[in-house]
């Protein structure tokens, strides 16, 4: 398995798809990288030469923020929003949607699961 940016990319998939296993690289970025390195996107990872893998590694490491660095940057951006107390930061803190979606109903993904509904028990009548 080729290891790029600390991620083992799948050997049996096309290079274009395999690169998307790296956090921060999607299909568009993947095709862009392959165009810059002059690698055919339809080639399987197992068929890449060592030189091609090295070229991929160099371009990704030099020009793209991926994996841990990108995750850290996103977390710091969210933390900054929460620290300055802006609307988006408050919504992050409360665990609610940020972009104006309704919350009276829906928003389940952001708000989390509700507990199981427990029906009221009937009290035994005295005879």
From Swiss-Prot:
Top-level division of the source organism's lineage: Bacteria
Alphabetized Pfam families for the sequence: Ribosomal_S13 (PF00416)
Region annotation (Disordered) ranges: 95-127
UniProt GO BP: translation
GO cellular component: cytosol; small ribosomal subunit
MF (Gene Ontology): rRNA binding; structural constituent of ribosome; tRNA binding
Assigned keywords, A-Z: Ribonucleoprotein, Ribosomal protein, RNA-binding, rRNA-binding, tRNA-binding
Stated role: Located at the top of the head of the 30S subunit, it contacts several helices of the 16S rRNA. In the 70S ribosome it contacts the 23S rRNA (bridge B1a) and protein L5 of the 50S subunit (bridge B1b), connecting the 2 subunits; these bridges are implicated in subunit movement. Contacts the tRNAs in the A and P-sites.
Family named by the database record: Belongs to the universal ribosomal protein uS13 family.
Assembly notes: Part of the 30S ribosomal subunit. Forms a loose heterodimer with protein S19. Forms two bridges to the 50S subunit in the 70S ribosome.
Protein name: Small ribosomal subunit protein uS13
Species whose genome carries this gene: Herpetosiphon aurantiacus (strain ATCC 23779 / DSM 785 / 114-95)
């Amino acid at each position: 398995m080729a290891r790029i940016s600390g991620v083992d990319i799948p050997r049996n998939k096309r290079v274009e798809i395999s690169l998307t296993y790296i956090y921060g690289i999607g299909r568009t970025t993947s095709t862009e990288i392959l165009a810059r390195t002059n690698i055919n996107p339809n080639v399987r990872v197992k068929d890449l030469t060592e030189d091609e893998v090295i070229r991929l590694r160099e371009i990704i490491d030099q020009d793209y923020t991926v994996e841990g660095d990108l995750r850290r940057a996103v977390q710091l951006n969210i933390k900054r929003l929460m620290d300055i107390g802006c609307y988006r930061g408050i919504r992050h803190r409360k665990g609610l949607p940020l972009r104006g979606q309704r919350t009276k109903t829906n928003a389940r993904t952001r708000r989390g699961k509700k507990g199981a509904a427990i029906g009221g028990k009937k009290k035994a009548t005295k005879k």
